[in-house]
């Protein structure tokens, strides 16, 4: 199939999708992205949510974040759930665009039907922490803790492990954030004292 694609012999959506899946299984996401991208551009493959998601994920796994970002955006707008906004938010976070990360992650929560809303709240808390919005960060970490019991696994043991891991993660971030908020408060008081006594 790959040779047929190289010679531009593929002309059916199914052929492009199968080749994409084979390349992804072979851990060749860059090639997979090129294949599905060509298929979409040449209109052999329908530009729908599913195929855009394939393309975005392949670019993402290829570390081609600049190419993944606009495709995630387009796919997220078409999606029925918020998962693709979460992926987009992770790209923004990885590239230090914190306002966009926060906006995208919040859109993901609003759209709903997320596999793991607890992790999204933790991510939002981390973004707020990085912006030194400690009260907002604390709110997100507390929301995470409130929703941990909603997370389900394959079985009881898996559920316990997932919940425990997320609970510990949220608690560590919450403690860290509260300590940092206090440290910054004390530094600001000292700075104010120094300015008044100068």
What are these regions (language model features)?
Residues 1-131, 136, 142-194:
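Alpha-solenoid helical repeat scaffolds
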Residues 196-198:
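Short, solvent-exposed mixed-charge patches
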């Amino acid at each position: 199939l790959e040779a047929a694609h190289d010679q531009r012999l593929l002309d059916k959506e199914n052929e492009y999708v199968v080749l994409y899946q084979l390349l992804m299984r072979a851990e060749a996401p860059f090639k997979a992205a090129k294949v599905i991208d060509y298929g979409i551009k040449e209109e052999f493959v329908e530009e729908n949510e599913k195929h855009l998601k394939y393309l975005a994920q392949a670019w993402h796994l290829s570390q081609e974040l600049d190419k993944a970002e606009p495709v995630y955006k387009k796919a997220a707008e078409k999606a029925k759930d918020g998962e693709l906004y979460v992926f987009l938010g992770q790209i923004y976070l990885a590239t230090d665009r914190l306002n966009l990360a926060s906006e995208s992650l919040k859109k993901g929560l609003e759209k709903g039907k997320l596999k793991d809303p607890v992790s999204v709240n933790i991510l939002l808390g981390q973004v707020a922490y990085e912006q030194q919005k400690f009260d907002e960060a604390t709110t997100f970490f507390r929301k995470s803790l409130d929703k941990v019991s909603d997370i389900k696994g394959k079985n009881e043991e898996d559920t316990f492990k997932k919940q425990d891991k997320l609970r510990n993660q949220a608690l560590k971030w919450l403690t860290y954030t509260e300590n940092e908020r206090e440290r910054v408060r004390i530094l600001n008081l000292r700075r104010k004292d120094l300015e008044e006594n100068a």
